[in-house]
Amino acid sequence: MRKVTLVFSAIAFAFSLNGVVQAKVQMPESVSSGVTTVELSQRQAVHWVSVEQIEKSLQDQPPMAIGFDIDDTVLFSSPGFYRGKLKYSPNDNSYLKNPAFWEKMNNEWDEFSMPKQIGIELVQMHLKRGDNIYFITGRTKTKTETVTKYLQEDLHIPADKMNVVIFAGDDPGKNNKISWMKEHKLKLYYGDADADIAAAHELNIRGIRILRASNSSYQPLPKAGRFGEEVVIKSEY
């Protein structure tokens, strides 16, 4: 009996020592508020959709005209824009008004752009449906361009299905894409920017948001889903 008592005493002593050691451990300095599992589960009320869900929603509809924005929607083109900023206006964004930049961007620097996987998947889905695809960009128009060529190659579009890229331009206070979307009777438009979704809403057509990559040169990032539009899941790449 005495041995049993000694064993329990030793165990109790060990636990008391462990408590003393733990009591002396200092927590590191907090660097953020942190997050709980409950908070992680409370996602924003966004209407997420997948490529498969979009395709299913169109299954009973005939082929239609649909449109895509280009930069940050089907192409990650930040390398060219970053190069242009460094070369023409490192301290501000005035390079976007410089014709020399657009000549480079529209004819050479898309060689450094990467096609987004979501762009390939969506384009291929619409091609399979027989839809007529238009690319409408806010880039400034130049006398020559190779953007059409790069898109055709990068997104695997057959030559006879590829429409020439439409350069709508970017005028302050004016959404130049609307007239082009109306002219081509688009029924659906994909874009990463608020202006893309606003243009679709203006014409009462279906606007679907593509997520802009967090490392895009186009900052700040927009609030996807803020207009109640559908947002394609995992579309940042």
Swiss-Prot record:
Key words of the record: Hydrolase, Magnesium, Metal-binding, Periplasm, Signal
Gene Ontology molecular function terms on file: acid phosphatase activity; metal ion binding
Reaction catalysed by this enzyme: a phosphate monoester + H2O = an alcohol + phosphate
Signal peptide (UniProt feature, chain positions): 1-23
Cofactors named for this entry: Mg(2+)
Cellular localization per UniProt: Periplasm
A GO term from the CC aspect: outer membrane-bounded periplasmic space
Chain's role: Dephosphorylates several organic phosphate monoesters. Also has a phosphotransferase activity catalyzing the transfer of low-energy phosphate groups from organic phosphate monoesters to free hydroxyl groups of various organic compounds.
Assembly notes: Homotetramer.
Main location: periplasm
Domain of life (superkingdom): Bacteria
InterPro entries (UniProt xref): Acid_phosphat_B-like, HAD-like_sf, HAD-SF_ppase_IIIB_AphA, HAD_sf
Cofactor descriptive note: Binds 1 Mg(2+) ion per subunit.
UniProt family annotation: Belongs to the class B bacterial acid phosphatase family.
Assigned EC number: 3.1.3.2
Binding-site residues, Mg(2+): 69, 71, 192
Name of the molecule in the record: Class B acid phosphatase
